[in-house]
Amino acid sequence: MKILVLNCGSSSIKYKLFDMKAKSILAQGGVEKIGLTGSFLKLTLPNGKKVILEGEILEHRTGVEYILGVITSEKYGCIRSLSEIDAVGHRVVHGGEKFNSSVLIDDEVIRKITECIDLAPLHNPPNLNGIYAVVELMPSTPQVGVFDTAFHQTMPDFAYMYGLPYSLYEKYAIRRYGFHGTSHRYVSKRACEMLYMSYERQRIISCHIGNGASVTAIKNGISVDTSMGMTPVEGLLMGTRCGDIDAGILTYIMEKENIGTSAISTIINKCSGVLGTSGISSDMREIDDAIEIGNKKAILTSDIYTYKIKKYIGAYTVALEGIDILVFTGGVGENQFRIRQKICDGLEFIGIKIDEATNHIRGKETIISTTDSKVKVVVVPTDEEFMIALDTLSLLS
């Protein structure tokens, strides 16, 4: 069975075509700068070589059509006809309270995703555009929606409710939703497979640390709490997002700077986090380089960054009444051993010990805890696209 996975962003589309029987990737790439000057499709050939194909891609339908044309082309294709694609799986960012699992897409599902646009105005519209494009271009092909938020719908109410008037929840569905759910679900399951441990009997803390970052507490296979909130701004210090902040600071800044909601949103989403505190970059690799030459703001940024992650690990150890497995994933979590080391330093009292030599491995599935560590510490490169493909396969079955 062949499954195409699409991840449609505001000006981009990432794609992977899987052969599920062979568990292999037949094609992968992405369209960039949709609706902008200089749009192009970048694809990765089986030998690893990158190819860039320029073209005028004005909207998502054109982008999806371009992708379908490439994967069936004589020069770069891997299939002869679109009829070989058995289903299309879509990443959908926000399912609100309407979806607690992946679903086959029909008119009713599309209507409900549309109703969630208020909760993710930048993400759900392009996700829908991808769905509409496939409806038009491959009308007989089943589609599946896999939601970033669905995994966290198992959180208890005392974990997802905010201390605001209850009427605001009733009117506007203001609550914690959490994100990166597909990633947390994939890496936590994969970690248990690596360790030959039952997923349904473990207390797992999953750290997805990249430009966006979140920590999730998973008990017996379900999410019980997560650091991101109603929006992806809450929680950890991220590339350009501030993370946890006293809400009173926002009104204070608005008054002092004489700015409105749009400007304050830009500050907390685009100008804060690692970039804001360091004044250097949103990329932790560049922060590491600056630390090497003694840059004080870079050192402070790294301290804030790792301290916040440690706080969440501590809090979630309490929420889970212990911890069996700690998982690192995401661009930083998978590749920056110094950050992993700094996070784990001082956590011996809860049973976390990591092997310094093994921890130096980058970007590979690795057990980095020592043999006598009570808590297993695992690095798992995330694969959200494969998880989407697995969900799609499961629903078709």
From Swiss-Prot:
Subcellular location: Cytoplasm
Protein residues bound to substrate: 91
Cofactor section: Mg(2+); Mn(2+)
Active site: 148 (proton donor/acceptor)
Residues binding Mg(2+): 7, 384
UniProt: ATP binding residues: 14, 208-212, 283-285, 331-335
Cofactor binding, note field: Mg(2+). Can also accept Mn(2+).
Protein purpose: Catalyzes the formation of acetyl phosphate from acetate and ATP. Can also catalyze the reverse reaction.
Cross-referenced PANTHER family: ACETATE KINASE (PTHR21060), ACETATE KINASE-RELATED (PTHR21060:SF15)
InterPro entries (UniProt xref): Ac/propionate_kinase, Aliphatic_acid_kin_short-chain, Aliphatic_acid_kinase_CS, ATPase_NBD
E.C. code: 2.7.2.1
Family of this protein: Belongs to the acetokinase family.
Protein name per UniProt: Acetate kinase
An annotated Gene Ontology molecular function: ATP binding
Signal peptide from the UniProt entry: none
The protein's assembly and partners: Homodimer.
NCBIfam families referenced in this protein's UniProt entry, alphabetically: ackA
GO biological process per UniProt: acetate metabolic process; acetyl-CoA biosynthetic process
One GO CC term on file: cytoplasm
Keywords for the protein's UniProt record, in alphabetical order: ATP-binding, Cytoplasm, Kinase, Magnesium, Metal-binding, Nucleotide-binding, Transferase
Site positions for Transition state stabilizer: 180, 241
Functional pathway: Metabolic intermediate biosynthesis; acetyl-CoA biosynthesis; acetyl-CoA from acetate: step 1/2
Catalysed reactions, semicolon-separated: acetate + ATP = acetyl phosphate + ADP
EC main group: transferase
